[in-house]
Amino acid sequence: MTDAAAVLNQHLYDNWSLTSPAKDDIYWAKSKVEAVDFAKIKKNYVVACYAPMTAANVRVLAKGVLLAEQNVMVDILVKVVTSVNNAVDVRENMRNEVYRILKASTPSGFGYADVTREFNKVESPDLTRLSLQVKMVCLA
């Protein structure tokens, strides 16, 4: 089965059009990034795509076609450089860019990808974090 997290990470990178932050200013992680790890990263922005601890859901459609649904977490982390409010604004711009990319095109090999849940908004003196759950569907 396709590694949905890796495909989504590459899809977001390839289609990122924001200039602030530009895609080269972002650390593109292929696993969850904890606050302690983020402090060690030299870049001020992280987009992390990873699979949560749930298995893919496979369903049988008509004529024996298998459909696989995979959930991928997309974490957006922004370091607080000037103020929490500024970092939150940047994080929301990055969130909107993820939504724009998913609405405009589907990652290669998948027929559907959409944000199904948003949670874990964190604002602290050091960072802001937002987690998005993306459902990705493909033929298995």
Q: Which residues fall in each region the model found?
A:
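Compositionally biased, intrinsically disordered low-complexity segments enriched
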Residues: 32-36, 72, 119, 135
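Short, conserved charged micro-motifs
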Residues: 83-90
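Oligomerization/assembly interface segments of phage tail-like spikes and tubes
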Residues: 64-83, 126-140
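Small/polar-rich, solvent-exposed N-terminal microdomains that initiate assembly or binding
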Residues: 1-63
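Acidic-leaning, charged glycine-interspersed low-complexity segments
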Residues: 18-23, 43-46, 92-140
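Intrinsic disorder/low-complexity detector
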Residues: 26, 39, 46-49, 59, ...
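Generic low-polarity alpha-helical segments
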Residues: 8, 12, 46-51, 70-78, ...
